[in-house]
Structure formats: structure tokens, C-alpha cells
């Protein structure tokens, strides 16, 4: 590492979440690339030596399981993936333990599912565990618990999981390492004129269209999921970097003034803790479709959502559960905790607040979603 690199790195201690995808850990093969993994461990160790904290979100359990079992021919279904994850997770963590041991660093394993993030108390318990590991100079290595997770309780990919982990531990930076150099103006594998986007201040529909499709055969995340993760994290005040995992010193350079890859600047006004949980934790149980006037009030003015602005309700959710708020064209504009069940809300949609008690026979307040329980997604 050069003197210029060392001088460029911020001196104030920071917490960095490093997400390693399957393609990074395998180098595009079907097996874990231990030579590359030890280099990644070395870079994390270098960060810790400089006084920073590191939290790792590591894919690779399924790849490790497939390698250990001799690449069996299994049907491409959840039961097969759970089998491979059950076999491979222990192999993966053993590999990380031995590699970090070279640098005298202890690790701790955390396996999470969506259910751990949906429930506020379990969310806080997970946060406390990660913070305790970090405080005791241990690197948490997090993965989704694929061996038991079903579609209903899966986060779905480790890109989004890493954003949620970043919120859990109050990270300063989230580094999403992939097999690409960053986000390009077009798919660089198909378009030779594609250019790397160095910095992003706002994530809009144009960027989402550029991000496009899915990931590799062994992995579950493509550039689109990385953009989703970046959007979640930056709203919580976390700077996000998408970069190539194979690039020299890419982890250490994430703290420099000119990091490799694509840098996503955090939102100027970071969400408070409760709203971070609403954004990161609960899976939405249904949709509340609102009219243009309500969109303007919620997004433009930061107002609470009233029944008058609700067009209709989709899905089934109870009072106190999180729902998606969309405009009349189905575009997501917010997430929030509904004061009314979907059944009740369907009855009072489009009605004045003063009429709620006469319609339902009870009243939980004039707001369908109070602004303190509402997180605006649209920018």
C-alpha cells in the first residue's frame, strides 16, 4: 500500500459493512477461491489496524456446500438450496475463521431471516449483538439463514441484507463488492461504449432502468438489487460504494477521498432510528393506493396520510403493520405503519376523517399513517 493511499484514508474511526457476493468469493467458478478470500481478509485486517470497525456480509454458503458434496446434480428448487446451505455454511465460516486467524482476528457468525427484522424487539436484539461483537474487537460475519428461510421469511439477497445490517450497526459506509467495476451507463458486457458512473447523488427511474437484470447462476443479486440496497442505505445516512471485489486494495480504498467504483452519497437528512426500522425491517403486508393530492401532501409537504386521499387498498394487513403506499400508477412513494387494518381502511377510503367513527364504530385517529410513522421513498 502506498503512502498516498494511507494519507488519503480518513483518520476518524468509521464502521464499514463489506458485502461479498458469491461471484467475488468464487471468482466466477463453482468453488470458493481461498487465495482471493485471504486477500479480502487482509484488507479488512488493515482497516481494523487503522482503528476502523468492520462488519462482513458474506455469501457463499451454497457454493461451499456444492463444492464439499462434490457438485451433486440437484434440482433447482428451494429444498436443494437449503440442503447445500446447511452443508456449506459451516464450511464457509470455518474458512473465514482460518483466514482471519492469520491476522489474529476473531470472528462471530450471525444468521438472519426476514422475521428477525420484521419484529421490532428482535431487530433491536440483532442490533445489540452486532454492536457487542464490534465493541469486543470481533468481526461479525452475517449471512441469510438459507437453511431454514422460506420465501415468506427471506430477505431475498445479501445486497439488501447488507443495507439492513448497515442500519443495524449504524454504519458509515457500505461496500458492495461484485464482479463489475461499478454502475455503468449501460451493461459493459454488451456495450463497449458503457462508461463508469463515478458518483450518484439521487437514485431515480433512469438509474433503475440502467441497473437492469439479475445476477449470476450461483448468486441471487444483480446490479438492480445493489441499487435497491444503495437506496435503502443512503436514506439512513450511509455512504454506499459499488466496486469490483477483484480490484487491488478495494476495501481499504473505500475510506479514501476517491474510492474505486461508483459512490452513492448519503441523503442530507438521515432518517431517525424508528423510521430506519420502518424502511429496513418489516416486510410490507399490503398496498395503500393514494390519489395525486395525497402524494403531493405526503411527498412534497411531509404530511400525514389521511383517509380522504386513499383510493383503495390491496393485500391484507392488521392495524400496526407496515404497508406500502403507492400512487395511482402503482409507483411506490412511501412505507408506513398503518393505524387501520386493511379491512377498516377499505371502508373509509376517500372519506373525511370526521366520518370515520360513524362508518367503523371506532376511531384510531384522523391519520391513516401518521407522518412520524411514514417514510417517503420517492424523491
Swiss-Prot record:
Compartment annotation: Cytoplasm
Span of domain PUA: 285-363
A biological process term (GO) from this entry: L-proline biosynthetic process
Enzyme Commission number(s): 2.7.2.11
Pfam families: AA_kinase, PUA
Annotated catalysed reactions: L-glutamate + ATP = L-glutamyl 5-phosphate + ADP
UniProt KW Nucleus keyword: no
GO annotation, cellular component aspect: cytosol
Source taxon at top rank: Bacteria
NCBIfam families: proB
Protein name: Glutamate 5-kinase
Gene that this polypeptide is encoded by: proB
